[in-house]
């Protein structure tokens, strides 16, 4: 006896164990005959495990037996129980892929309603003895593979609905009960969780989209995911960041072109805030590209259209809008974390501003009582030299317009070391060292007197003599032992020769 389930992904032909499980098979066949399973969704799909259906509400808590469903449609007589007792046999196990079982409700005694599942892998012995096996899929294993590969949410529900569109009974060996209801003409889709929007089983998301639009959609998705990744690792302030529209990127420059030359040429389009040619950090040679920041976006647009492929110092330059957000990222980090607490710009961060970190430490030290000592000028120590700002000819070129991974504004390890050396404990130790008494200096000078040096040299000389004499004695002892062994071997040879002569 067989039943065919027509799903949205293909057909499944199931052979039922009518002889071994008559009660379970009759309940399943009669529900199929009443079109109870029509348009039901597979609401629980676990990869390489099971695909569950048979619940009109698609929640896992609905469904009922044949007797309960018939009574709900035409009440007459006493109300039957919602579940029936299935046949759970040890001879029927979940050994092969495509095994059909009734889902047993965790009640006492265990019972089944209308929910069933199909195994998606072999040898799932965990389910043996817990659920009632009553059939096997004999055709349509490729359909099970499609169900197994479906994308699901965190609850196991496929993102695109997989539904049972129609059920065809190939053979029904059981007669209809006396109170059997009339067979409906056209099934109505049950209201299964209308609160969540899902892709319909008949819908193809890419069917009506042209190839160009589908490619554009794919590129936008990849760009959004890449931006989100850069935001997570800290290279972008936020995923939806856009590069500034008033900054131009100029490349293919002549190595002899200077900042002043470009600024003079581009200044006719509007006010220029900065014009910097990026240079090599070691040699100072031009890298043949520059960044020009205008006061207004309209001026940058005019320069973009008018200066494209213009001859500058015998070179055809290329002008485009800058795609770097490094300057924007640094300014946002410094504004959102001015005191240096945590983050990339804080004490232990990877980037940030050294002066801002020192100001934050000074504020905390002022609260704890250390600011007067640290901030007070020291007459014995000259003030530190001012830190020069990087110019267009400095190492690495410009400070404002680097690549996304540019991190030149981060403080060096020497700066962090200087900051640690300015801690109150180290300052206290330095004061103690500077204020130590002259008596200790005199004692140290006395320890280095010529007499003590002569005594120390004499002791070292005696120690070396003793070591040399000990080594000589050891060497002489080794020689004596070698001579004794040689004499013994010589005497042994003489005795052997005398014995041979006597025997002759």
Curated annotation (Swiss-Prot):
Top EC class, one word: isomerase
Protein origin, superkingdom: Eukaryota
Protein name (Swiss-Prot/TrEMBL): Peptidyl-prolyl cis-trans isomerase-like 4
Predominant place of localization: nucleus
Stretch list, region Disordered: 330-504
Family, per entry: Belongs to the cyclophilin-type PPIase family. PPIL4 subfamily.
PROSITE patterns tied to this protein: CSA_PPIASE_2 (PS50072), RRM (PS50102)
Gene3D superfamilies: 3.30.70.330, Cyclophilin-like
Bias type Basic and acidic residues, positions: 356-381, 416-504
The gene coding this protein: CYP6
Originating species: Cryptococcus neoformans var. neoformans serotype D (strain JEC21 / ATCC MYA-565) (Filobasidiella neoformans)
Catalytic reaction equation(s): [protein]-peptidylproline (omega=180) = [protein]-peptidylproline (omega=0)
E.C. code: 5.2.1.8
Domain (RRM) ranges: 246-324
Function of the molecule: PPIases accelerate the folding of proteins. It catalyzes the cis-trans isomerization of proline imidic peptide bonds in oligopeptides.
Compositional bias of kind Gly residues: 340-354
Domain PPIase cyclophilin-type: 1-169
Keywords: Isomerase, Nucleus, RNA-binding, Rotamase
Pfam families: Pro_isomerase, RRM_1
Residue ranges with Polar residues bias: 330-339
Molecular function in Gene Ontology: peptidyl-prolyl cis-trans isomerase activity; RNA binding
UniProt GO cellular component terms: nucleus
Compartments (UniProt record): Nucleus
